[in-house]
Amino acid sequence: MNDYIVVKCGGSMLDQLNDVFFDCIKKLQQQYKVVIVHGGGPEIDAKLKDCNINVEKRDGLRVTPKEVMDVVQMVLCGSTNKKLVMNLQKHNLLAVGCSGCDGNLLQVQPVSGEIGYVGEVSYVETALLKGLINMNYIPVIAPVGINDNEIYNINADTAAAGIAAALSAKELILITDVDGILHEGKLVKKTDESEIATFIEKGVITGGMIPKVQAALASLKMGVQKISIVNGTKDFTEDTGGCIGTTVTRGVSIV
């Protein structure tokens, strides 16, 4: 059991996770070293609304001035992270919640002054993750990072990709509420960058699936070898250790 698997669960999925999801994590943990990265978009939006703070996004990234960063940190590092940790432990999966600023886990470079405290992963302190895993804990990571003693918001997809690349993970699994990419009603089991571009152009991939495949493509560019888009509300694991869903790699034809 030497290979790492990184599981990214978006904020919109956290309230949909059921016993099947946690059973899948148990099965993955029997064969791999598992790290979980979560988002928290809907809860952040709700809290900002409660605080009468405007929600603004540019090119898929949350505009994060200081007052927004305070809320992001409170939600991601607090309630969202701890709910997921407690849910894992309710299902007999030992977990430790931490953020990217704990132990300098995720160091970042600012994306742009125009969008405030938003960073891209520049360094991952993998020793911390490996230490937790060696003690049989699942690290559950809130996607904030640190630069020059300031905390930055990180897009959860890019945080997960950065961690997967740093760990040379065998796979990055993106948890969604659909079975994967569908073409003419059938699941596309394997695809690559060029085919995804064609699918988007032809309207095969639309709506909420577009940001998911864009996250997969960005992950490939960061060095992740394989990304699986799976339905977290169903059993997405195979007995062989693979995933049931759409697998995105470099230069692979559709099967």
Swiss-Prot record:
| UniProt-annotated site: Transition state stabilizer, residues | 8, 212
Its EC number(s)? 2.7.2.8
Per the record, the major location class is cytoplasm
Which residues does substrate bind? 40-41, 62, 153
Q: Which reactions fall under this protein's catalytic activity?
A: N-acetyl-L-glutamate + ATP = N-acetyl-L-glutamyl 5-phosphate + ADP
User: Does the keyword Nucleotide-binding feature in the UniProt annotation?
Assistant: yes
Q: Explain the purpose of this protein.
A: Catalyzes the ATP-dependent phosphorylation of N-acetyl-L-glutamate.
Name of the protein: Acetylglutamate kinase
